[in-house]
Design a protein with these regions (language model features):
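A short C-terminal boundary segment appended to hydrolase-like catalytic domains
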Residues: 36, 328-391
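Signal peptide processing junction and immediate N-terminal pro/mature segment
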Residues: 19-34
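Bacterial N-terminal signal peptides that target proteins for export
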Residues: 1-9
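N-terminal active-site segment of His-dependent metallophosphoesterases
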Residues: 33-123
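Bacterial N-terminal signal peptides
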Residues: 8-17
Length: 391
């Protein structure tokens, strides 16, 4: 772990940097230690005081906001509350309060994974994560939805691996009062895979660590196949591994989970005109725009990487190749634009989260930098209109 001193006016800020090699060793150590973690029961995060209504009850809602972010794991997980994540939560609470009396209040929060360093260690959930999220669910009253990251349930594609099962058990305990119940219509039984609808927007959460799993894929496909698109004009998917990224997990590297997302879910998402993917894994902000055509005309899918939730920051490592994606989508005339690239140093990429404001089939995005990152303007401003109805 190295340090970099940033000068912000008269204020010197120390940023701790994590090299890709160190990040890889940390992930391997976390996975290896999960089996032998102490037997402590994970406390359930408190349910929101203002839960989402039944899907049918919100059918007429076309204007609201929600928050997205990811990668909150901290350097002191298991011994203290996550400090950097706490700064994020403080800012979120202020944003939720600011928007509460507007026409587009914040109705839920999405977290794309890596809640803690070692998801198999109950102490890390209990001492570093749960109480921070309680501030959102009880203090602000908003529903909170978490997708599992590789640090939460390991990156193993083997559903029965002991380390994965240990992490999954803790994840499910923490989220027991937040996500649909096991066996519910909007939950895949036995999996951390679920969906929900609010107003004109439908959200699917999947476990990208097992993106090659047939049972999960078929369930997601069935959810999308059966969707009332007259009502749900906006469909959003959130999960951990990005489709494209230019950090230590991307660039010339294509991880197995990423490859499975590209080959299996990308065509499915285009088929169903998914508006946006919200991911993390890379600890910075990045934005890709995918354009394609089908019998209904031109379409756009925004791929947002928002992994600035408190984990050690990453930097730009190189462009990923889009050649195979473009070749696979040749019939749909698929193309990609790298709209926002992360900076070349971790200190260029602040802790942040994203506010998405829905107004009919239009979505506006605002990136909010935190602490020394206040004023972060990746689009020469902090806001961007995401096309007209996904086109």
């Amino acid at each position: 772990m190295a340090r970099r001193i940033l000068m912000c006016g008269a204020l010197a800020v120390t940023v701790f940097l994590s090299s890709p090699a160190l990040g890889d060793r940390t992930a391997r150590t976390a996975a290896a230690s999960q089996v032998g973690a102490p037997a402590e029961t994970v406390r359930a995060i408190a349910p929101p005081t203002h839960p989402l209504p039944a899907e049918t009850a919100s059918a007429g809602v076309t204007k609201f906001s929600f928050i997205a972010y990811g990668d909150t794991r901290g350097r002191q997980d298991g011994t203290a509350l996550q400090y950097e994540h706490g700064l994020i939560v403080d800012s979120m609470l202020a944003t939720i309060k600011r928007l509460d009396t507007t026409a587009a209040p914040v109705r839920f929060v999405l977290q794309s994974g890596d809640a803690v360093v070692n998801g198999g260690d109950a102490r890390q959930w209990n001492r570093s994560f749960v109480d921070l999220i309680n501030r959102l669910t009880t203090g602000a009253g908003v529903p909170y939805f978490l997708a599992p990251g590789n640090h939460d349930v390991t990156s193993s594609a083997d559903l029965n691996a002991a380390a994965r099962q240990n992490g999954l058990r803790n994840y499910l305990a923490a989220t027991a009062q937040l996500i649909p119940a096991d066996g519910a219509t909007r939950r895949l039984a036995g999996y951390p895979t679920y969906a929900f609808g609010y107003g004109n927007t439908f959200v699917v959460a999947l476990d990208s660590n097992i993106a090659g799993d047939d049972t999960q894929f078929n369930w997601i496909k069935a959810q999308l196949d059966g969707l009332d698109r007259a009502r749900y004009t906006n469909v959003i998917a959130f999960f951990h591994h990005p489709v494209l990224s230019s950090g230590p997990h991307g660039g010339s590297t294509v991880e197995p989970a990423t490859l499975a997302i590209r080959t299996r879910y990308e065509p499915l998402f285009r088929q169903h005109h998914v508006r946006m993917t919200l991911t993390g894994h890379e600890h910075f902000y990045e934005h890709w725009v995918e354009r394609y055509q089908d019998a209904t005309g031109p379409h756009r899918m925004d791929h947002i990487v928002t992994g600035g939730g408190g984990a050690p920051l990453y930097s730009y490592q190189g462009e990923p190749s889009t050649k195979d994606l473009i070749a696979a989508g040749r019939d749909s005339k698929v193309s990609f634009e790298h709209l926002v690239k992360p900076g070349p140093a971790p200190g260029d990429n602040p802790y942040h989260y994203v506010v998405l404001s829905v107004d009919g089939d239009n979505i506006q995005l605002e990136v909010i930098g935190v602490d020394w990152g206040r004023g972060f303007a990746p689009y020469r401003s902090a806001k961007l209109q995401l096309g007209d109805g996904g086109r």
